[in-house]
Amino acid sequence: METDRKWIIVRIDGKIAAASTDYRLLASISSYLAEQGRRQEKKIRPGKPGNTKGCIFSKITAEAIGMDELWELRHKTGWEDLMLFGTDFQKKVWHKLWELTHAYVRTTDEDNAGSDTRDGHGYQKPEDLTLVSYSDFAELCQNRAGVRAVAHAIGLNPVAVIIPCHLVVPKESIDKIREINKKAEATIFKGDDLCISSILNDSSIDFGEYSCGRELKRELIIRELTGSWS
């Protein structure tokens, strides 16, 4: 399965800056930080090369982990645990993506009155987790007229899975799923996870582009909606 591959987690001073299936984002971030350091150096000591103390970050690390570890990390990660590099618009889109699986819900637990809970880590996963079309997601971002700009920002998401860009798919895919599901309503498998998994595995359903590959996007969607891998 595509999910058997290793994931590279990049951290800067302990905060997650990237999650990907290769080292390209590590190289990109390292290059960006080096450039920022050079600019900072010029501000501190203009015209005096050799100063390397301008970098505003002290440590960048990368580790390879498995899919299950990444899934667990996703449930432990708060928005404040991320360090994202991008425009304000991109960060707005990424935050809205993050909210698809990390929505804040007020608890009714008397022992934790007024606090926010989710899987024991300060947030709660929404019960009605589902796929979202690009146009509907653009509306969530209050930018329905700018679907292409929103889609472009989604494609640049540096922290795959933790920021679940795989949940945004073409509207045609959602319509196709509903059509197949409607036919399944009449069967004894109605609502069964096996039936849902079979529908999501249907090769006629195209879930769209994904930076880590189309097949992996399908497997991540199946995990999200059924709780198990394909």
Please give the residue ranges for each predicted region.
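Catalytic-site neighborhood detector that most strongly recognizes the C-terminal catalytic loop/helix
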Residues: G208-R214
